[in-house]
């Protein structure tokens, strides 16, 4: 989850959701924002579509939608979003915090520069979220054999 970006749109949590979903099956990844924006900027949709993600269907969602559900992980994508930890403390097993910068901070109006910033954000997010997935989640999601091995074994 993240706080609304400086252009009143929302992109970081949506980007993180799509990136995490691309790493494998077995996860339910939801996205929400504190002060959720109204839409995802076209430049973000364009960069994500160039990387093979479909951004056309989902709309931004407020964190209150998920506040009463139980979660294994809540991932915050900017320091401002960490304020939600107090509200959701009883329903979250583990918090993970990242600090991904707002690609629209500073009010950039040059389209090429916006795209460059969003592309750089995507690259950083993909790298760091994959490291998180690999270190925290992958072992838990792999199929297990009756012997307890979590990779394909030869016991049968």
Residue ranges and their predicted role:
Residues 2, 6, 11, 78, ...:
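Disulfide-bonded cysteines in secreted/extracellular proteins and peptides
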Residues 4-65:
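Conserved active-site segments centered on acidic
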Residues 14-16, 41, 83-87, 107:
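Short glycine-/acidic-enriched loop or helix-start segments at secondary-structure transitions
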Residues 31, 76, 96-99:
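Structural signal for conserved beta-strand scaffold positions within catalytic alpha/beta enzyme cores
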Residues 36, 81, 102-104:
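Residue-level detector of flexible, active-site-proximal loop/helix-junction positions
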Residues 66-77, 118, 147, 153:
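Cytosolic catalytic domains that perform sulfur/thiol-centered chemistry
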Residues 69-94:
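Mid-chain, well-packed structural core segment of small domains
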Residues 85-148, 152, 156:
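Phosphate-binding/catalytic loops
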């Amino acid at each position: 989850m993240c706080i609304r970006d400086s252009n009143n749109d929302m992109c970081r949590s949506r980007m993180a959701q799509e990136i995490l979903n691309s790493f494998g099956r077995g996860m339910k990844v939801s996205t929400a924002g504190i002060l959720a924006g109204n839409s995802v900027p076209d430049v973000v949709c364009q960069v994500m579509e160039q990387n093979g993600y479909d951004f056309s269907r989902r709309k931004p969602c407020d964190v209150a939608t998920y506040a009463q559900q139980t979660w294994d992980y809540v991932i915050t994508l900017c320091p401002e979003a960490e304020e939600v930890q107090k509200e959701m403390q009883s329903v979250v097993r583990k918090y993970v915090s990242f600090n991904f910068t707002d690609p629209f901070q500073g009010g950039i109006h040059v389209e090429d520069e916006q795209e460059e910033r969003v592309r750089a954000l995507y690259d950083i997010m993909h790298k760091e979220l994959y490291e998180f997935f690999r270190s925290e989640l992958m072992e838990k999601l792999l199929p297990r054999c009756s012997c307890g091995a979590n990779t394909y074994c030869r016991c049968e």
